[in-house]
Amino acid sequence: MSSISLIPVCTDVAIRDMADMASAIWHEYWPIVLSEGQIDYMVDTMQSFEPIKYEIRQEGYLYWFVLDEEGKRVGYLSVRPETPEGELATDIQPGEGKLFVSKVYLLKEERGKHYASRMLDFCEDFCRANGLSSLYLHVNKHNEMGIRAYKGRGWYIAEDSVSDIGNGYVMDDYIMAKEVALS
């Protein structure tokens, strides 16, 4: 099974590198589902330097580069610990919080190597280490490969979500969730 390591993204240089990787991944992966205009808009407003920096510095998101066995960057991961109400979790009782898995992305040539499974294992371990009893994420309803992979790991569709993201675009997602045993 492929192993990974995760390196925290904290500096402006690392954030810029991550934004470059995000743009490359998004422009390669999403044209089968989203228009080029929506991809550009979402990268600019959610996956570029300023939005990532804001999420890290102001909203409590944690970002990591994912490295393969040789130390090569193969993708990135982002999460945010939250209260049951969806607020940033800073001081909660064990079992009361949840983990928002915001971003799970791999470069094209790195998919199919079980890195995404290791990334999700990391998220579950993060929950156990921090007393968070569940995980959730948003997945595009047309991302059949992602939905199938999550279901195969015990995730379930918790609800439908259609969100206006501005500029005439919407995110048409499923919110998928998974409970985590803390003991």
Question: What positions do the PLM features span?
Answer:
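C-terminal "cap" of GNAT-fold acetyltransferases
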Residues: 3, 12, 93-99, 133-136, ...
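Short C-terminal domain-edge/linker segments immediately following a structured domain
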Residues: 37, 49, 108-111, 115, ...
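A short, hydrophobic/aromatic-rich structural module that often spans a beta strand
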Residues: 73-81, 123-145, 158
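Conserved glycine-rich acetyl-CoA-binding loop
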Residues: 104-121, 128-130, 141-148, 152
